Structure formats: C-alpha cells, structure tokens
C-alpha cells in the first residue's frame, strides 16, 4: 500500500466519521428549530393539573414528593416549578431547553462511552449513527411539558455509568457523586429507580467478567454506590405506587 493510498484512506475515514456524527447532530438541531417554529405555548393534558390546583410553581416538599401517575417525581416537579417561576411557564422555551439538554446530553454521553470503549473513532461514529432513531421530538416533546421526565433518568444513569467505567478519581469522591446521580434518576420517575437497580446489578456482575484484581474491586465498589441509590429510590417508589396506591393509576 502506497503512502498516497494510506493518506486517501485516512481522509476517507475521517470524512465518514464527521458525516456519521453530523447527521444525528443535524437531526437534533432541526427538531429544536421545528419546535421553535411550530410549537404552541399552551398547557396540554397533564400540564393543566398544576394550574388547576394552583401549585405548579410550588417547591414545598409535600408537593414535590406527592405520588402522581403511579410514581414519585420530585426532581421533575422541581424543574417544572423553576420553569414556571423563571420562564413564566412558557411551553416553547421550556420544551426547547429540555429537548436540547436531554437529547443532547444523551448523545454526548453515548459518544463518550463509545469512543472510550472502542478506542476507534470510525467504529464509534458508525455506532453513534444509530442514535438518530431516538431523535423523535414527538416521543417526549411537542405535547406535555412534563413528558420529558421519563427520559431524564437516562441522562443521570449514563452519567453514573461514565463515572463507574472511566473515572480514575478516588472512590471517596466518585462514590457519593454516583449515589447522587442514581438518586436523581430514581426520583425523577419510577422507571429511573428500576433502571438504576438493574444497571447497578449488571455493572457488579460485569466487574467479575471484564476485570480482575484491583480494577475489579474498584469497579464493584463504585457499582455498590449505584446499588445503594437504586435501593434508596426504589423502596419509596414501590411503596407509594404499588403498596399504598395498589397499582391504581391516579392523578
């Protein structure tokens, strides 16, 4: 293989990487642009509940930790209250911010996991192209302001996974941070609590399979912090949504 052909292959691979990363980013940009252009600033379905009760702006613990739709969602309700206070409840502004931050965050975190795991930009970009299928604004945006609460736990979980897998800082610093991220995921929506539990158990199992020695112990210790967060959040979630409410969809 000549130097010229090597150079051509290198440039071709570089352009392919850029193209495969560009399309998902472009899709997110167009989704945000479409929402700014065609979005309607009006509450929709579940958004009306806070207005009718007159507490949509409330940050009281009783309000934030109430059980609604078979879940505790204090993190999401707090974000809704802040949006009401500082954005005037503007649906267009709120959903644009949540769409770009949540979907953009998921894209960035997945790219980081791919590039760190594969150690090859071309392979990572090919895999990254598949995130384009999750960039459907109508999934969690374009209807209720609060619908994105169900996607937000993924951001916290992926952040925790990044710390577990790649962070080399002291467990004394990383452990509590992983716990906080897990608790945020678990108290954003009930699916987040279940996701944290499943993820932590999976990570602990992988620590025996993928690593050995000190690295395996460190990986497992960080996973234990995530497990603690899963137990902390899933216990009240299960109590309020299944035991107390008896699985009845209310609110």
What is the role of each PLM region?
Residues 158, 173-196:
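Membrane-interface alpha helices of multi-pass inner-membrane proteins
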Residues 1-30:
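Start-transfer (signal-anchor) and selected internal transmembrane alpha helices
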Residues 5, 195-231:
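Perimembrane helix-loop-helix junctions
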Residues 44-46, 73, 122-165, 187-189:
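Membrane-interface micro-motifs in multi-pass membrane enzymes
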Residues 96-121, 159-163:
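Transmembrane-helix motifs of polytopic, lipid-linked glycan transferases
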Residues 38-43, 56-99:
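Membrane-proximal lumenal/periplasmic loop motifs of glycosylation machinery
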Residues 29-49, 139-140, 236-251:
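Helix-to-loop transition at the C-terminal end of transmembrane segments
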Residues 157-175, 212:
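Membrane-interface transmembrane helices that cradle and orient dolichyl/undecaprenyl
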């Amino acid at each position: 293989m000549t130097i010229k052909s090597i150079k051509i292959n290198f440039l071709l691979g570089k352009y392919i990487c850029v193209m495969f990363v560009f399309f998902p980013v472009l899709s997110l940009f167009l989704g945000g642009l479409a929402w700014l252009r065609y979005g309607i600033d009006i509450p929709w379905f579940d958004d009306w509940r806070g207005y009718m009760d007159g507490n949509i702006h409330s940050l009281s613990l009783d309000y934030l930790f109430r059980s609604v739709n078979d879940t505790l969602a204090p993190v999401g309700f707090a974000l809704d209250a802040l949006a009401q206070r500082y954005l005037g409840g503007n649906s267009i502004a709120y959903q644009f911010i949540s769409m770009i931050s949540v979907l953009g965050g998921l894209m960035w975190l997945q790219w980081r996991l791919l590039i760190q795991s594969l150690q090859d930009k071309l392979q990572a970009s090919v895999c990254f192209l598949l995130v384009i299928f999750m960039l459907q604004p109508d999934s969690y945006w374009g209807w209720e302001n609060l619908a994105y609460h169900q996607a937000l736990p993924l951001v916290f979980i992926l952040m925790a996974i990044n710390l577990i897998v790649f962070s080399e800082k002291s467990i004394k610093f990383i452990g509590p941070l992983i716990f906080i991220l897990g608790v945020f995921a678990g108290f954003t929506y009930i699916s987040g609590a279940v996701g944290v539990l499943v993820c932590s158990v999976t990570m602990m199992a992988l620590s025996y399979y993928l690593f050995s020695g000190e690295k395996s112990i460190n990986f497992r210790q960080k996973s234990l912090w995530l497990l603690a967060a899963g137990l902390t959040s899933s216990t009240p979630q299960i109590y309020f949504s299944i035991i107390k409410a008896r699985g009845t969809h209310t609110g």
